[in-house]
């Protein structure tokens, strides 16, 4: 994947980065797919998008504390979401920091700092991830220390917030874990959820004072999906999904 890079000298950078190993970074890249196709190239609009951010003058240059603070304020305004809870400790003065901005179709996917060959993810934009996954998956922040709600073992439904969480909780509560258990591919999962949000049988609809909320049911092979979605402009955002497996009752071990 092509990258645009900014070299930063400040040790304070480490306070903003979340630690991932190179193998985890490879896994992160592997998961960003559109119907199974790996995102490999930067679109022609990427350079213009970078120019529009005002960060183009920092590409492949070292910057001081002032520029670093300005840079961080700019990316903070894009609503960056941490990808992991652990924070890498400070390193020595001689280390160089390279922060790379990834683009796809003119959108910033992620920023990471490369310290000694180890990738340290800072965050990703929810808009970018939602676009990559078909603009129907709502991305929610993962707040460190937030307790997981207890699961109701008596229910045959598994309530799964459709937040694409590229962190530890992605494995624990993500929809993909459920589909893996049921032997459905990631691309099929994405296309199924997209169809469920648009083609399902309407059960109920209402307005919450801001947007229209739809509740639909959709059958896919042995699965029944009850999908709650929100209409925002011309975009359908999936907020919640209850999944029933016709072959068995879902257990706590499913996700």
Swiss-Prot record:
Propeptide, chain numbering: 1-101, 145-255
Subcellular location(s) per record: Secreted
GO biological process, one term: defense response to Gram-positive bacterium
Keywords, ordered alphabetically: Antibiotic, Antimicrobial, Bacteriocin, Secreted
Signal peptide: none
Listed name of the protein: Propionicin-F
Function noted in UniProt: Bacteriocin with specific antibacterial activity against strains of P.freudenreichii. No antibacterial activity was detected against P.acidipropionici, P.jensenii and P.thoenii.
Gene Ontology CC terms: extracellular region
């Amino acid at each position: 994947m092509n990258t645009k890079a900014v070299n930063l000298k400040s040790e304070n950078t480490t306070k903003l980065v979340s630690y991932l190993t190179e193998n985890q970074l490879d896994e992160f890249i592997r998961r960003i797919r559109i119907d199974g196709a790996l995102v490999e190239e930067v679109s022609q609009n990427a350079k213009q998008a970078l120019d529009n951010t005002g960060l183009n003058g920092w590409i492949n240059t070292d910057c001081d504390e002032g520029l670093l603070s300005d840079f961080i304020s700019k990316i903070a305004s894009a609503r960056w979401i941490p990808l992991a809870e652990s924070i890498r400790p400070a390193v020595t003065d001689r280390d160089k920091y390279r922060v790379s901005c990834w683009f796809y179709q003119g959108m910033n996917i992620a920023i990471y700092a490369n310290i000694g060959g180890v990738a340290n993810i800072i965050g990703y934009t929810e808009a970018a991830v939602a676009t990559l996954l078909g603009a129907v998956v709502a991305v929610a922040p993962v707040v460190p220390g937030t307790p997981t709600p207890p699961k109701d073992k008596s229910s045959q439904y598994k309530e799964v917030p459709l937040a694409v969480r590229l962190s530890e909780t992605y494995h624990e509560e993500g929809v993909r874990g459920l589909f893996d258990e049921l032997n459905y591919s990631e691309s099929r999962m994405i296309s199924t959820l997209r169809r469920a949000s648009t083609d399902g049988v309407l059960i109920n609809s209402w307005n919450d004072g801001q947007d229209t909320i739809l509740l639909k049911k959709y059958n896919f092979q042995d699965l029944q999906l009850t999908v709650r979605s929100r209409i925002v402009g011309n975009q359908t955002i999936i907020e919640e999904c209850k999944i029933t497996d016709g072959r068995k009752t879902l257990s706590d071990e499913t996700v």
